[in-house]
Amino acid sequence: TNPVDIMTRVTYELTGFNAAKVIGIGTTLDTARLRYLLGQYFEIDPRHMHAYVIGEHGDSEFVPWSQAMMAVNPVLDILEKYPDRYKMDDLDRISNDVRTAAYEIIKAKGSTYYGIGMAVCRIVRAIFNNENSVFTASVRLRGEYGLRNEVFIGNPCIINSGGANRILELSLTG
């Protein structure tokens, strides 16, 4: 339920579970939407788009474009190489579309529970099968980005049978 990051922290505090075992959906669904839209934009299979939506799920989430890759090529380099075809304004529109997608789905269907359910199933499968898969789940940061341990936000992390096993800190540059 939303606000997912706050509810994840409340769950952590009320249960007393190890922080690695308390995982919220975070921006997992937003990241999947982002990759899908980037795949359409760059005309490539979305599985080869490596980009993340991070931060608090909702209006303040963002895409660190400096870390976005199309296969092995940085997205920002592609924009620079093909300025007549690809534009930063288009990426900003895609980012905004991802941020507001839930509102559009709720307006049309009344809720977003199918997408969320699929994302939860995918995370549970990663835990049960000890997959070491990367998700932008809502997890407690451990000092990453200079933030205190009390903060739960959507951030790339490796999830396996131990839970959110490792937080992957992105280099955030202008």
Where are the predicted features?
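Rossmann-fold NAD(P)-binding glycine/threonine-rich loop
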Residues: 1-20
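C-terminal substrate-binding/catalytic lobe of Rossmann-fold NAD(P)-dependent dehydrogenases
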Residues: 14-21, 30-174
